[in-house]
């Protein structure tokens, strides 16, 4: 969370490359991408922040975000609501929407799209907060979800062969006594948050159509991570476990109308690093750095074309790597913050080391997780999609486990180093 892509350290990013290639880059929303202390000027032309005149033009007053303001909804410390992240229905106070920061960024983006008359190609970066917890949303999205259709939660029957960070968070959040009705309400609220994002995407698309930009636009919609939302009796997320509810995120790609495409859902495994690779190919830009993303354009015309045989995730840290523990988040809490149960586990340096470095390898059938200091994990996703039965010590699975280990080793060999594209001179020039 506090180690961003630093251009001074040889870590460029898609926005800066587009900006350097004469794109007009408009950025509205949170950062979590580049070092805040270095500013945004090398990455975008506009970093949108609404002012008083914007709110007057829109006809709304800004409403407080869910992480601040009145936190009475958390209840008292020590109760089973305090770390639940469950806020519930947002009160409209006589208005049609709860005009929080996401709505402001969306309205700012639509204003920009409708008013833009420049000659530069556009890049619009809109990193909204929803559906990140706390779990809360206004009507009509709060009641839009049929509670009877909310899918059941995944639950562990045993915890001793699971990562210790999970048991630590479980004990810290204190939600083990929740009834299924309470979990269903929380999960339905989360789905309502997703429905609000869907609606907001529709409004953005309408503004692109009104500006005659939709057909020429490539649109990418995805999430940076998932959420437990009650699975395994947990809320929010971890930084070093890789259940599908956390790592298998939605990814939607709408290409420009001029591109050949067979519409539909693709079942190939992809990684989020395939997003910038695809964007570069759409823009006809050769990035000035080596990367391991694979463009998705070939999947547009052939739904059966191979893409990746496996995908990977990494997280956690080694002992004594305190600088990678997200300790900065703990310093900013000023008390028992919502994230305290997780951050406390990440700060531990005793015999139990919950924030252990870990790496996941997943293919279409299996998931293998290598953990530096704890028990590895192996799941058969075909028979156990909820990843509840750890088969790492099952002798009958030894060959499959070895195959996944070898695949992870090959991936490390393929991606462990990045050689700069620019060559150096061998001799001193002065």
Q: Where on the chain are the PLM-derived regions?
A:
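Active-site regions of oxyanion-processing enzymes, predominantly non-cytosolic
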Residues: 38-61, 99-156, 209-218
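Long, internal low-complexity/basic segments
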Residues: 175-181, 185, 318-325, 372, ...
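A short beta-strand-to-alpha-helix junction
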Residues: 4-12, 184-195, 241-247, 259-277, ...
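Histidine-centered active-site microenvironments of extracellular/periplasmic hydrolases
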Residues: 134-137, 206-264, 268-271
């Amino acid at each position: 969370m506090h180690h961003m892509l630093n251009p001074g350290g040889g870590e460029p990013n898609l926005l800066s490359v587009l900006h350097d290639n004469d794109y007009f880059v408009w950025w509205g929303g949170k950062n979590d991408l580049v070092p805040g202390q270095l500013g945004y000027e090398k990455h975008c032309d506009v970093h949108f922040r609404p002012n008083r005149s914007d709110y007057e033009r829109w006809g709304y007053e800004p409403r407080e975000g869910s992480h601040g303001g009145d936190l009475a909804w958390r209840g008292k410390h020590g109760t089973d609501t305090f770390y639940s992240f469950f806020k519930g229905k947002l009160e409209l106070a006589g208005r049609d929407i709860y005009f929080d920061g996401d709505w402001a960024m969306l309205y700012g983006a639509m204003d920009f799209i409708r008013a833009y008359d420049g000659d530069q190609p556009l890049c619009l970066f809109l990193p909204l907060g929803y559906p990140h917890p706390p779990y809360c949303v206004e009507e009509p999205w709060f009641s839009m979800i049929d509670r009877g259709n909310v899918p059941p939660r995944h639950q562990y029957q045993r915890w001793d062969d699971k990562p210790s960070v999970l048991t630590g968070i479980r004990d810290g959040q204190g939600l083990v006594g929740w009834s299924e009705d309470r979990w269903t309400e929380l999960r339905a609220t989360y789905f309502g948050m997703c429905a609000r994002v869907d609606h907001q995407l529709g409004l953005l698309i309408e503004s692109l159509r009104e500006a005659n930009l939709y057909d020429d636009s490539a649109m990418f919609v995805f999430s940076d991570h998932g959420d437990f939302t009650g699975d395994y009796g947990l809320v929010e997320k971890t930084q070093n476990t890789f259940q599908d509810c956390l790592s298998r995120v939605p990814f939607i790609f709408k290409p420009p109308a001029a591109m050949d495409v067979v519409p539909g859902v693709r079942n190939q495994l992809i990684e989020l690093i395939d997003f910038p690779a695809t964007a570069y190919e759409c823009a006809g830009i050769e990035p000035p750095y080596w990367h391991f993303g694979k463009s998705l354009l070939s999947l547009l015309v052939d739904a059966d074309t191979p893409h990746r045989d496996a995908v990977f995730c990494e997280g956690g840290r080694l002992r004594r790597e305190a600088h990678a523990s997200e300790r900065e988040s703990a310093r900013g809490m000023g008390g028992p913050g919502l994230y305290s149960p997780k951050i406390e586990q990440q700060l531990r340096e005793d015999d139990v080391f919950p924030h252990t470095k870990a790496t996941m390898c997943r293919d279409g059938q299996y998931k293998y997780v290598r953990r530096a200091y704890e028990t590895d994990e192996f799941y058969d996703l075909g028979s156990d999609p909820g990843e509840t039965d750890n088969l790492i010590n099952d002798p009958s699975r030894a060959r499959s486990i070895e195959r996944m280990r070898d695949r992870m080793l090959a991936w490390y060999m393929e991606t462990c180093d990045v050689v700069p594209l620019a060559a150096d001179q061998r001799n001193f020039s002065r």
